[in-house]
Amino acid sequence: MKEFIISEAQTEKAVLVGLITPEQNEQKVKEYLDELAFLADTAGVEAVKRFYQRLDYPNSVTFVGSGKLQEIKEYVVENEIGLVIFDDELSTKQLRNIEKELQVKILDRTNLILDIFARRAQTAHAKTQVELAQYKYMLPRLQRLWTHLERQRGGVGMRGPGETQLETDKRIILDKISKLKRDLVEIDKQKSVQRKNRGKMVRVALVGYTNVGKSTLMNQLSKSEVFAENKLFATLDTTVRKVIVDNLPFLLSDTVGFIRKLPTELVESFKSTLDEVREADLLVHVVDISHPTFEEQIEVVNRTLSEIDKTEKPMIMVFNKIDAFTFVPKDEDDLTPRTRENIDLDELKRTWMNKMQDNCIFISAKERTNLDALKALLYERVKQIHITRFPYNDFLFQQYDEE
């Protein structure tokens, strides 16, 4: 995989840049930059300053206006900042012009996410997927790269007659992309065989926004340790475990979390992870109820799921982290409209129970609150699916050791 863009030796300091547009109001942009700061922290970067600008659309040359770019430059120079991160994907022209003006390292949201994925990838499969995504991202941006890729390959004897350095680099990357795609086809074939060999057990997939507690819930349900951390994208590789509830076995998979503005390169590269979602019989959508914008996160996940798989699948909504939920009651004489922070947990429960009927539950995976109720719900849903598929199968009546 490509070397990390962000140094691991010491914590880098960075400034964040976001645009307020007709599509993104000021409140939304602040939320997006909160998430960008969390992404930066996950990558080992401390976000020390944020810059906002109100524009109808991004400047095609420098993303922000010339005056704002000058303001950023003055801050960067005065405070010896070495990194500026933009919340949206930058074009080749924008990257080149911003780097030329600021004379520091520039990342956009996509590049930052790719860097985190490169750090998180553990298996050969995940590493191959990330490397493919990196090269796809790099290809249209070759003109502004500071170093040439042919150094990684020796260079001598590799250039065709009359080729420029840029053409050589493009060919090297295209060759790498082709090889990585071939590698992934072979890996995906193996994964597909593994999935087919799982037998008649019902498949349940945990899905949700990143950092909502899917891995913690996986640990609680499967009684085996899956890596869980308060960082974005703690899980990259799909983990599959056999879970037994009241003598009923099923397969439970923990998948990579979704996020706003997820790069197309990553969505396409992580095909095998998405296959777990496509081939699942039941989806368990885990939500962080304590997050101030959890409803928008639900929309992001549902939108991504509809892009992955057009078929309707049964789903259970699991509202996690009720132990961390807080709200601010309104004073009686406060006539301003209520916001999300003024709504208590009981009201949210009533709203979502009414919307989802019996397919909704509120838990704390960390504190094990309401886990027995979730297991009972899973038991009923998995049993329904199994009986529908195998009405005369004695599979449900075999004896299993829950330990």
Regions found by a protein language model. Give the residues of each.
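Switch I (effector-binding) loop of TRAFAC-class P-loop GTPase G-domains
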Residues: 196-199, 220-250, 259, 264-269, ...
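C-terminal-of-GTPase-core extension/linker across diverse P-loop GTPases
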Residues: 1-16, 37, 136, 140-212, ...
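Conserved catalytic network of the ASCE P-loop NTPase/AAA+ motor domain
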Residues: 8-9, 76-78, 242-246, 251, ...
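Switch II of P-loop NTPase G domains
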Residues: 2-6, 30-34, 57-74, 237-238, ...
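Switch/connector loops and helix/strand junctions flanking conserved nucleotide-binding motifs
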Residues: 24-27, 59-62, 92-97, 114-117, ...
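Conserved Switch II/interswitch segment of TRAFAC-class P-loop GTPases
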Residues: 21-23, 59, 89, 278-299, ...
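N-terminal accessory targeting/assembly segments
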Residues: 1-113
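Short alpha-helix plus adjacent loop in nuclease-associated cores
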Residues: 111-130
